[in-house]
Amino acid sequence: MKVGIIGAMQQEVAILKEAMTNAQTVNKAGCTFYSGQINGVEVVLLQSGIGKVAAAIGTTILLDEYQPDMVLNTGSAGGFDSSLNLGDVVISTEVRHHDADVTAFGYEMGQMAGQPAAFLADEKLMNLAEKALEQMDGQHAVRGLICTGDAFVCTAERQAFIRQHFPSVIAVEMEASAIAQTCYQFKVPFVVVRAISDVADKESPMSFEEFLPLAAKSSSEMVFKMLELLK
């Protein structure tokens, strides 16, 4: 069994990389691939770079060349669910693009031509994430729709647009839908497990940059627990 793990930024993969044994590093097409073992599980850790194009390029190489049996997308996200606070975890049930619009041709908002409106996370991996969560005392999590776009959502106007078209959204970020679409086309199961670094409509004494290391720690701990359960 081989697990693909994807994070966009160095801060989002650093803790996982440090835990790897027998690690080998390959740089290709602007992406960095670390292959080795974490807690006895064979993994390939991808630092893809930020945004949907970078994520799609990296995920394609990961799936084609390393052929993992499953993909976990980790890192940070912006919270949209009112129950979320900084450091909480979100687990995807489905993933959608929030910045795609070909509704003029009869598609749903967020649906790309020739693609499903939503990319569904794997049920077994969602349940695995829930079991991992049970072993993390005090860690709050919400399960639901995660939306992706090539923009850092920080204006009230954009937040309102996303809420209008995707009323069940729990979090937004910048890579997951590209990863999900690539996994869908390769027929590889995936789940997104991210930690909240900022929350819409809630003031925080910490900036995104200040909280990112803590979000990375929370999401990495979830991945560690999931890998332990896979052994």
UniProtKB/Swiss-Prot annotation:
The keyword Methyltransferase does not apply. Keywords: Amino-acid biosynthesis, Hydrolase, Methionine biosynthesis. CDD domains: MTAN. The active site is at E12, D198. Its EC number is 3.2.2.9. It catalyses: S-adenosyl-L-homocysteine + H2O = S-(5-deoxy-D-ribos-5-yl)-L-homocysteine + adenine; S-methyl-5'-thioadenosine + H2O = 5-(methylsulfanyl)-D-ribose + adenine; 5'-deoxyadenosine + H2O = 5-deoxy-D-ribose + adenine. GO terms for molecular function: adenosylhomocysteine nucleosidase activity; methylthioadenosine nucleosidase activity. The keyword Ligase does not apply. Belongs to the PNP/UDP phosphorylase family. MtnN subfamily. This is 5'-methylthioadenosine/S-adenosylhomocysteine nucleosidase.
